[in-house]
């Protein structure tokens, strides 16, 4: 009787574990089929769109922050005989203008990716899944960075320039060629 009581909770946990894992598998299968599955050409087109939106928003935010900085700098009264941080005041103000536009350029992808998410809300789940799968392929197939040299440079290490299936296949061939050259010459 005591043995049955001890074994029974273990069996119950095993059954419960199977029940939850089975339902999780069904939920994953149902979740992946409920949304529209994104094809690889569609994924690469969306990836290119996201990159263009991010670049455009970077340029726009750099322009806006430079204009805001210019509006502030144009109202500042400076004394040309006084040094700012050990430099001429005009050099410091121009440096501040460039720094503000650089900061705006760096903040641009935040706005661009938010705009991309809103614009492509329906395809976002499939896009994120394909992006994870694509980045796993990149990690698995990229070459070792320690074997690079001037005569044998690395192919695109992060896969940022891959924009189609043909370019992906070419990237795989380039990685294989790099591995072969690194093995032959070392």
UniProtKB/Swiss-Prot annotation:
The keyword Transport applies. It is a multi-pass membrane protein. It comes from the Eukaryota. Pfam families: Pam17. Keywords: Membrane, Mitochondrion, Mitochondrion inner membrane, Protein transport, Transit peptide, Translocation, Transmembrane, Transmembrane helix, Transport. InterPro entries: Pam17. The keyword Hydrolase does not apply. Component of the PAM complex, at least composed of mtHsp70 (SSC1), MGE1, TIM44, PAM16, PAM17 and PAM18. This is Presequence translocated-associated motor subunit PAM17, mitochondrial. It comes from Eremothecium gossypii (strain ATCC 10895 / CBS 109.51 / FGSC 9923 / NRRL Y-1056). The gene is PAM17.
